[in-house]
Curated annotation (Swiss-Prot):
Belongs to the FGGY kinase family. ATP binds at residues 24, 281, 326, 427-431. GO terms for molecular function: ATP binding; glycerol kinase activity. This is Glycerol kinase 3. The lineage of its organism: Eukaryota, Metazoa, Chordata, Craniata, Vertebrata. Its EC number is 2.7.1.30. SUPFAM superfamilies: Actin-like ATPase domain. Keywords: ATP-binding, Cytoplasm, Glycerol metabolism, Kinase, Membrane, Mitochondrion, Mitochondrion outer membrane, Nucleotide-binding, Transferase. It comes from Homo sapiens (Human).
Length: 553
């Protein structure tokens, strides 16, 4: 019996969603925003030294081609012709840094991932040269001087990798974040590939002036970055070039947004004061501040939200960034073996329904917002002989929620108007225990779209709306209504506050582990007076606890 033909109402738009943990290609109906098909490939992360995180740029590129081909095959099985795909958008992990040879097309080193900490000494050295406690950088970029952003990663490559140095000397080097590497490669690479980025990704490099929307000569001189290796900066919605290979050869790439900006667009947060929180490898809360750069007094970033067209106005956002969210689940799976699959975490947490006084601060890459404390490291505290892997699983989920509470509190103080509810998205939002915990800890409702792929949707919307494509209207009256699932707080406010205040104590204990300096704004005496015996006893306790949890006699 022949397969029934599926009706396709209107043009289709594809989206590459290249994240820290995986690559996906998804295809949407531009009239209804319905997700028709997708394919996903997990991406390896390499940890060559403590604090270092790398990925293979060629593996990332190959995963994009694989996802496109597999998705097109699935569309064929649904009797949907791929000729209906009129445009492709790109969303990507931000800050991750790639340098490649424009003559050979080969990467000159692995991609240095946003989580990577190798540049801490570079940051400390540079900070001594900045008057006014980093305000020189922050006033231009909206960002604190941190290992998180691309400029110091690029500086490290220029200082330490001979291949990169030689390519720069010979005028063969190109720099880009993951979007630039992908767009250059997909539009032809060595045969005329387009070397560009969009304003949202450029704003995460620490080299981009968010007021003039241009690469900043002063910043490039300060970091010692040759401007000729930087990509051309474009809007988030315009035709950059055409696909030059694969099943979708000839289709325009016409949308590009850093993943968190893409999620803001996909959640349709187009009004001032609208906010969303994305739960992925990290956790990122963005609030639309309109055409105005709002600078935080409470540890948040100021960043470009989007610019949806060459002649369209730029929108800005306040952002709270948490380094480790979904990554803590991966760590429990891959490093400790507490779970075999990421999905098991919900089952373990549900078994106990409490952390039983156990608190987990997953500061594997230091602490991001609102502390910006690179000296912090991960701790699990409050352990007793009763603690088991279920309690640790529950504490890991709570940690994601507590970190979100910290950045939401900071955002409420900066904006002056507390959020009445929190819109959420990302892979972790399928975990109902996590979503209920989040509502309890924030003590406001949490709402999530039933179609969770908002990051890819945002990239598709930008691509479909581009001039010359024009298959997706972003006018408010044309946007599809989003069906939401709602989680209401189920504990009283007092209990919520007690749990949160205990978490804050745990956070303070995580600081000051890897430098002799005290955490910014903290009391140095707290960290200078810890006796050696404390570290010996705590280390023994952790060892015994680990053996107990793993069942080693």
């Amino acid at each position: 019996m022949a397969a029934s033909k599926k009706a396709v109402l209107g043009p289709l738009v594809g989206a590459v969603d290249q994240g820290t943990s995986s690559t996906r290609f998804l295809v949407f109906n531009s009239r209804t925003a319905e997700l028709l098909s997708h394919h996903q490939v997990e991406i390896k992360q390499e940890f060559p030294r403590e604090g270092w995180v790398e990925q293979d740029p060629k593996e990332i590129l190959h995963s994009v081609y694989e996802c496109i081909e597999k998705t097109c095959e699935k569309l064929g099985q649904l009797n949907i012709g791929i000729s209906n795909i009129k445009a492709i958008g790109v969303s990507n992990q931000r800050e991750t840094t790639v340098v490649w040879d424009k003559i050979t097309g080969e990467p000159l080193y692995n991609a240095v991932v946003w989580l990577d900490l190798r540049t801490q000494s570079t940051v400390e050295s540079l900070s001594k040269r900045i008057p006014g406690n980093n305000n020189f950088v922050k006033s231009k970029t909206g960002l604190p001087l941190s290992t998180y952003f691309s400029a110091v990663k690029l500086r490290w490559l220029l200082d330490n990798v001979r291949k990169v140095q030689k390519a720069v000397e010979e005028k063969r080097a190109l720099f880009g974040t993951i979007d630039s590497w992908l767009i250059w490669s997909l539009t032809g690479g060595v045969n005329g590939g387009v070397h560009c980025t969009d304003v949202t990704n450029a704003s995460r490099t620490m080299l981009f002036n968010i007021h003039s929307l241009e690469w900043d000569k002063q910043l490039c001189e300060f970091f010692g970055i040759p401007m000729e290796i930087l990509p051309h900066v474009r809007s988030s919605s315009e035709i950059y070039g055409l696909m030059k290979a694969g099943a979708l050869e000839g289709v325009p790439i016409s949308g590009c947004l850093g993943d968190q900006s893409a999620a803001l667009v996909g959640q349709m947060c187009f009004q001032i004061g609208q906010a969303k929180n994305t739960y992925g490898t990290g956790c990122f809360l963005l609030c639309n501040t309109g055409h105005k750069c709002v600078f935080s007094d409470h540890g948040l970033l100021t960043t470009v939200a989007y610019k949806l067209g060459r002649d369209k106005p730029v929108y800005y956002a306040l952002e709270g960034s948490v380094a480790i969210a979904g990554a803590v689940i991966r760590w429990l799976r891959d490093n400790l073996g507490i779970i075999k699959t990421s999905e098991e975490i919900e089952k373990l947490a549900k078994e106990v329904g409490t952390s039983y006084g156990c608190y987990f601060v997953p500061a594997f890459s230091g602490l991001y917002a609102p502390y910006w404390e690179p000296s912090a490291r991960g701790i699990i505290c409050g352990l007793t002989q009763f603690t088991n892997k279920c309690h640790i699983a529950f504490a890991a989920l709570e940690a994601v929620c507590f970190q979100t509470r910290e950045i939401l509190d900071a955002m409420n103080r900066d904006c002056g108007i507390p959020l009445s509810h929190l819109q959420v998205d990302g892979g972790m939002t399928s975990n109902k225990i996590l979503m209920q915990l989040q509502a309890d800890i924030l003590y406001i409702p949490v709402v999530k779209p039933l179609m969770p792929e908002t990051t890819a949707l945002g990239a598709a919307m930008a691509a479909g709306a581009a001039e010359g494509v024009d298959v997706w209207s972003l006018e408010p009256e044309d946007l599809s209504a989003v069906t939401m699932e709602r989680f209401e707080p189920q504990i009283n406010a007092e209990e919520s506050e007690i749990r949160y205040s205990t978490w804050k104590k745990a956070v303070m204990k995580s600081m000051g582990w890897v430098t002799t300096q005290s955490p910014e704004g903290g009391d140095p005496s707290v960290f200078c007076s810890l006796p050696l015996g404390f570290f010996i006893v705590s280390s023994m306790a952790m060892l015994i606890g680990a053996r107990y949890i793993s069942g080693i006699p």
